[in-house]
Amino acid sequence: MNSIEFPLLDRTTQNSVISTTSNDLSNWSRLSSLWPLLYGTSCCFIEFASLIGSRFDFDRYGLVPRSSPRQADLILTAGTVTMKMAPSLVRLYEQMPEPKYVIAMGACTITGGMFSTDSYSTVRGVDKLIPVDVYLPGCPPKPEAVIDAITKLRKKISREIYEDRIRSQQENRCFTTNHKFHVGRSTHTGNYDQRLLYQSPSTSEIPLETFFKYKSSVSSPEFVN
């Protein structure tokens, strides 16, 4: 088990008296009492479930999974986050008491993963919704990597000052669920106009009249008994 060092903690005082600060005492009390809210949406969460077994035994870090955000101070996001799930994730984070922390686990959570190129319904990184403390890349990350991320989070907690963290979150809020969508052309008709096919959607938009004109010109398929 990795020990956490407190640089401001003085253990040389005689008569077994330890002098410290209120911030260090508060941080020390939270190191071994992280209660995570498990927000798993896809395959990355299966790797985190391995930590519950006796092989890795994440109870030695004081982790107690909670099902209510009001009783959790750590949310671990694992898997793809869609646009419809984004407001729910933000609401869960806002219901958690301060101080609260976030671990982003897996490529889909950090950048959108393989869905980040052509999917209109995937959030390109959970840090666009909530502030992230530790990024854990991988597809999926191994249980050993999850333990390392928790260890790094504990080291971060041991050195932070509560007032500075609250001030930083208030000045750098990144909650947003607003995305702009555009009407696109159908790609399953089997009949395309070459001008529309090679027209870059980033430089110009297809007028609605042109879109419905070419859509209605395609004949419906015929079925033969």
Swiss-Prot record:
Naming one, the record's GO cellular component terms include: respiratory chain complex I
- One Pfam annotation reads Oxidored_q6
The record's EC number reads 7.1.1.-
Q: Does the keyword Cell membrane apply?
A: no
Please share the entry's free-text remark on the cofactor: Binds 1 [4Fe-4S] cluster.
| The reaction(s) this protein catalyses | a plastoquinone + NADH + (n+1) H(+)(in) = a plastoquinol + NAD(+) + n H(+)(out); a plastoquinone + NADPH + (n+1) H(+)(in) = a plastoquinol + NADP(+) + n H(+)(out)
What GO molecular functions are on record for this protein? 4 iron, 4 sulfur cluster binding; iron ion binding; NADH dehydrogenase (ubiquinone) activity; quinone binding
An example of a Gene Ontology BP annotation on this entry? aerobic respiration
Names of the cofactor(s): [4Fe-4S] cluster
Q: Keywords, A to Z?
A: 4Fe-4S, Chloroplast, Iron, Iron-sulfur, Membrane, Metal-binding, NAD, NADP, Plastid, Plastoquinone, Quinone, Thylakoid, Translocase, Transport
Residues at which [4Fe-4S] cluster binds:
C43, C44, C108, C139
* Database matches in InterPro entries: NADH_UbQ_OxRdtase-like_20kDa, NADH_UQ_OxRdtase_20Kd_su
Membrane topology recorded in Swiss-Prot or TrEMBL = Peripheral membrane protein
Q: What class of enzyme is it?
A: translocase
Q: Which cellular compartments is it found in?
A: Plastid, Chloroplast thylakoid membrane
The protein's assembly and partners:
NDH is composed of at least 16 different subunits, 5 of which are encoded in the nucleus.
Which PANTHER family does the record cross-reference, listed alphabetically? NADH DEHYDROGENASE, NADH DEHYDROGENASE [UBIQUINONE] IRON-SULFUR PROTEIN 7, MITOCHONDRIAL
HAMAP family per UniProt = NDH1_NuoB
The entry assigns this protein to a family as follows:
Belongs to the complex I 20 kDa subunit family.
What is known about what this protein does?
A: NDH shuttles electrons from NAD(P)H:plastoquinone, via FMN and iron-sulfur (Fe-S) centers, to quinones in the photosynthetic chain and possibly in a chloroplast respiratory chain. The immediate electron acceptor for the enzyme in this species is believed to be plastoquinone. Couples the redox reaction to proton translocation, and thus conserves the redox energy in a proton gradient.
- Which NCBIfam families has this protein been placed in? nuoB_fam, PRK06411.1
The name of this protein is: NAD(P)H-quinone oxidoreductase subunit K, chloroplastic
